[in-house]
Amino acid sequence: MPVLTPDSALSLGATWSQVRRSAHERAIAAPFPTIDEETWRYSRIGELDLATFAIAETPTTITGESSQVTVTRVPASSASVDSSLADLFAQSTSTDLFNSLNLAHMDVVVVSVARGVVAPQPIVITHTLNGDGSVYFPRLVIDAAENSEVTVVERFISDDGVRSLVVPVLDARAAQSARVRYLAINELGDKSWQIGEHDSVGERDSDTLLATVALGGDYARVSTAARLRGQGSNTRQVALYFAGGTQMHDFRTLQEHAAPRTTSDLLFKGAVQDTAKSVYTGLIKIHNNAKGSVAYQTNRNLTLSHGAWAESVPNLEIETN
């Protein structure tokens, strides 16, 4: 699949075209990150050369669909999209390079759960990323309406020896009293890279879980932001990871309390051996209006070899008493 340009985007529907064009322009304007930036400190971003990858459509299979849950697929090659979905993406103003690249080239899966509906079984989305020299941009949207419940599992798979890059983005929204459970499983091969972003928003009395199992990849990074926007909302972030050889797992997290009496709980546990590395940096941010909020943040690492290395940097920012 060729690289999308502002001119080639003209063939898309009006709003859809503008979404992709704007994202493409933001990506061009965005500087390539360096380890001098706090959010990329300790990373291996200096080893990545985007020019060596060709954009490919994401091979995806989905199981667990049911009549109670709407699952919509919109591949990057689609010339048009539902207006409500286009309007949703049009609201994105992120200037982050990788988020903008994803928005410009995304293969989208949307999971929508209506008010009061409890999904009867987990929805499992599997991306098989075996194109050597390919870059993939899957994007998952989970939209859980009031008092609904859904569990989504997203798997990323590639074979050893396949040099690929995957840049996934998750947008999860839990309306009032909704329950959203998300699990990402990294089963990538030894030459694959991942630079991912998970973002959830919880409204009043909602409950969200963002979980990650990271086992594969040469360099695998996930930035996770759980935002509590409604009073009484709750979120958990959990990760389990293991790295060997020269692997590196890189986690950056945000627990944002923007409403009163909200609760967040984070537990990341992992082990590294040989000359493998892991990085965890996390921020708990409690806004001035988030009185009565409670937050927990725990990162535990087991170093199994003298050459292995684990970095852990917790941070706290409180604007209220």
Describe each PLM feature range:
Residues A86-N321:
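Conserved beta-strand/loop scaffold segments within soluble protein domains that form the structured core
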Residues M1-D107, V124, L267, Q273:
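N-terminal amphipathic, basic helical "cap/leader" segment at the start of enzyme domains
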